[in-house]
Amino acid sequence: MVNLKIAFAICFKSLQAAYQVSCRNLRFPIEHGQRSCPSQEFFMSFTFEKCFTSDGVEIEGLYQIQPKVFGDARGYFLETYSEKDFFEAGLKMKFVQDNQSKSSKGVLRGLHFQTLHPQGKLVRSLQGKVYDVAVDLRKGSKTFGKYFGVVLDSEKQNQFYIPEGFAHGFLVLTEEATFAYKCTDFYHPEDEGGLMWNDPAIGIDWNSVAGDVEPLLSEKDKKHAAFDSNNNYFDINGKWTN
């Protein structure tokens, strides 16, 4: 009986070791920013989803990102960033500065960009909900002057990646929201640029998400210029051209 138990234990350990080796080696290729295997969530802590205009045209470089959240009776755990997973998805940016802001309902921050020091941003809501928007300002892009918006929700833990060459802004939908940014370049106040939050040429439909909320803007954000389709803004790689 003792020998049988020993044999069973050895067999179980061997099977367990073999399974662990197979799991380590079973790495699936990235296709269109996502793993091609339906079991991807076991191996990767994030899913990456491309973004499209309302008429179905892909806005290259924008990604909605959903971390895998592990929850139980104690609470939850998640990875908010992994260089390994992001690099495998083709997002090989380097972040150099983290920012955080807190705003009340109806606050609209934007639409912002930096000129000579453009910033890529990985953004998420730590508390509350915001409607987050990116406008493509890359001259030569097939979506130049187009926008994409997504609701970022602290309960969902979803994220949004915006590369260099975009204007960015958000509107707070809940009583309060705490917002976090990871940036690929440092803040340079001398390089601040912006667009009108309600520019008719861009046509961001804030009301579809926020209803009749009257946005609260800073004096600076009230004075941003209108979008000019003849302005080069950034090149296709997100570098300032003016």
Give the predicted meaning of each segment.
Residues 42-158, 174-176, 183-242:
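Non-catalytic, conserved peripheral segments adjacent to functional cores
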